[in-house]
Amino acid sequence: MIKGILFDKDGTLIDFYKVWGTAAGPVMDRLLADCHTGEREFLKKELLERLGIHDSEIDPEGAFAWMTYREITDVIWNFLKEKHPELLPEKQELLGKVQNEFYKEVVEKRRDYPVFTEVKELFRKLTEEYGVKVGLATTDTYASARTCMDCLDASGYVTFWGTDDGTLPVKPDGKLVELAAESWYIKPEELLMVGDTPNDMRFAHNGHAFALGVLSGTGKIHHMECVADDLIESVAELPAWLEGKRGEKNGRN
């Protein structure tokens, strides 16, 4: 029986392409601002590709789709070291800049977030009608994730914030599943992880949770079907999926 659900945020609850996909280009422009104008576009294209962004497509196994800010910064730092070592900042300084620039694009400049279903109503239904605990497991920071949930008026239903602030394990470390389960006084096997990337599914399995993939983000069916325990098109189908699971359980009884 499912008693708790961890949601990935980007690509699962909100549209990854419309939020993060549109932010990547402007952020890279600012990070490469000190490079010669004539080569900047070439460097930008190559850097985006190293992050797993190929024109309008985003590789679900690429850095941009699932890595933490620190890991993304490592990719950018190594790229700058290779191409323009004379412009290379301290890694911690670059990390701060990467975080700040993305925060400007995906938080400060936004007044709303494109979603796949009304998140507040989904969380309300899960909490009040299904008696399920709701949490987030995201590689985004707490400040960014909280602002997003506040904007969607859904923060009040979130009782576990698995964010990347340097104090908690990050996906795919299954210890984060264990921490969520402990905080909810349930077993990891009673927890459902909902996400849009193969990394989300590996994370679920590492923590002994059920891995439910959604096809609304970067992971397409050929990426997800071999790693997910089950698949749905988007979180809009989650209540019906849960009803189906309840029916299966009652049928066995």
In which residue ranges do the predicted regions lie?
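Conserved phosphate-coupling serine/threonine residues in phosphotransfer and NTP-handling enzymes
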Residues: T12, T138-D140
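A short, Lys/Arg-enriched amphipathic alpha-helix followed by its capping loop at the start of a domain
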Residues: L122-V132
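Asp-based, Mg2+/Mn2+-dependent phosphohydrolase catalytic module
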Residues: M1-I5, K18, A33, K120, ...
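Residue-level marker of regulatory loop/turn positions in helix-turn-helix DNA-binding domains and
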Residues: V115, A137, P169
